[in-house]
Amino acid sequence: MIILAIESSCDETGVGIAELSEDGTVTLLADEVASSVDEHARFGGVVPEIASRAHLEALGPTMRRALDTAGVGRPDVVAATIGPGLAGALLVGVAAAKAYSAAWQVPFYGVNHLGGHLAADVYDHGPLPESVGLLVSGGHTHLLHVRSLGEPIIELGSTVDDAAGEAYDKVARLLGLGYPGGKVLDDLARQGDREAIVFPRGMTGPRDDPFAFSFSGLKTAVARYVESHPEASQADVAAGFQEAVADVLTRKAVRAAETLGVSTLLIAGGVAANSRLRELAEQRCAESGLTLRIPRPRLCTDNGAMIASFAAHLIAAGAPPSPLEAASDPGLPVVRSQVA
């Protein structure tokens, strides 16, 4: 079965094509992405209207490249991110997917963007066993219990304020590093001393929810430090901030796996591309006897391949198609795998 999937939840226009075999194996055939990030950079963040217009302009050419790369003329299924995300951006991808579904007379699946991030790892490491999932991106930070990708995902905890990726962008802006902040702040942090400045670790007290996160206080602490120490090394500030984020994320994720008695930790989402998060997660999983799974950096960021993978797993589990009347949902919760 050939599955074509469209991703348009934010500022990347992605088209992925995957093949679902009879034994449940999912093979990636094409992964084409067009980004409008440069158009948003001068505004210091994603502008929804610009993102929607960019999707309209990029979707056709991106679709053509994906079909050519895969050598596919007509897929058996069309899927799309139906939420969560920017309302206008979602509408572009969902409307296009429905149109292709109707034209090709094939089923349509509207699936969850967040589940897609988890499913991306299958391309690199094969079938996913029962896992604790740490999903970290620009707009989301969740700890999840993933029994299988075809079953409902269970949320263990999430951020009570800023997402980890959002904190990265805000601190990068504070340091004058521009947008998007994740990659440039990571690069700067590698030049600094992560022990030179110790920033607070939110929600790590004995009375705090062990599976909840908070990064607002950390962001404020960095701002106050920079204001009171104008001579401080930006690299040290970046390294101290990054260490605080990676420490909390990995500490809570490992604890969740140990609490549930699950032997695999999956880290996914855009922030999973961060070098220190990957390094510290590997170290702590080795110490705890856990198997760590993280997709290659390209599959951590938004793409259509991850949506194709998630749709494939839902189909393999017997999920019904979504009606063409299904509406996109900008606030779709992680526990809803699809809109059916």
UniProtKB/Swiss-Prot annotation:
Principal EC category: transferase
Cofactor(s) needed: Fe(2+)
Chain sites annotated for binding Fe cation: H113, H117, D302
GO biological processes: tRNA threonylcarbamoyladenosine modification
Cofactor note (record): Binds 1 Fe(2+) ion per subunit.
Keywords from the named record: Acyltransferase, Cytoplasm, Iron, Metal-binding, Transferase, tRNA processing
Binding site for substrate: L135, V136, S137, G138, G139, D169, G182, D186, N274
Catalytic activity line of the entry: L-threonylcarbamoyladenylate + adenosine(37) in tRNA = N(6)-L-threonylcarbamoyladenosine(37) in tRNA + AMP + H(+)
GO cellular component, one term: cytoplasm
Protein name: tRNA N6-adenosine threonylcarbamoyltransferase
